[in-house]
Amino acid sequence: MAVRIKLTRLGKIRNPQYRVVVADARTRRDGRAIESIGKYHPKEEPSLIEIDSERVQYWLSVGAQPTEPVQRLLEITGDWQKFKGLPGAEGTLKVKAAKPSKLDLFNAALAAAENEPVAEAVTPKKKAKKDDAAAESTEAEAAE
């Protein structure tokens, strides 16, 4: 039985997400898989690539052949170089920058708010109306 490591497609119409699976070479693209060994989300920035290195090494050692897209993913993660014994086994996987925690964001916003000058909000239209009303009432009293 010829075994291949290939991608099965998941996700919506314009948002593809793939699973890296081990399956018989004769099965359909989204057909029955022997084992799921990772996932690949190409639309994220940077692309999410999670592959179980230990299982990939096992399947490659027993003769499973990766498809071309999967081989490119294995080269990025460094698993293909490790299997072939090539230099540069670290791969070129880009890692997403860590998001700041909500507590850190809150503390930064609080510190920025404390540094701002404290002054009451001024709405000249409302004050002008009050001043005009006060002036009219004093004029009316003076006229009487």
UniProtKB/Swiss-Prot annotation:
Residues 115-144 are annotated as: Disordered. It comes from the Bacteria. Disulfide bonds: none annotated. Belongs to the bacterial ribosomal protein bS16 family. InterPro entries: Ribosomal_bS16, Ribosomal_bS16_CS, Ribosomal_bS16_dom_sf. GO terms for biological process: translation. Pfam families: Ribosomal_S16. GO terms for molecular function: structural constituent of ribosome. Keywords: Ribonucleoprotein, Ribosomal protein. The keyword Ribosomal protein applies. The gene is rpsP. GO terms for cellular component: cytoplasm; small ribosomal subunit. PANTHER family: 30S RIBOSOMAL PROTEIN S16 (PTHR12919), SMALL RIBOSOMAL SUBUNIT PROTEIN BS16M (PTHR12919:SF20). This is Small ribosomal subunit protein bS16. The lineage of its organism: Bacteria, Bacillati, Actinomycetota, Actinomycetes, Mycobacteriales.
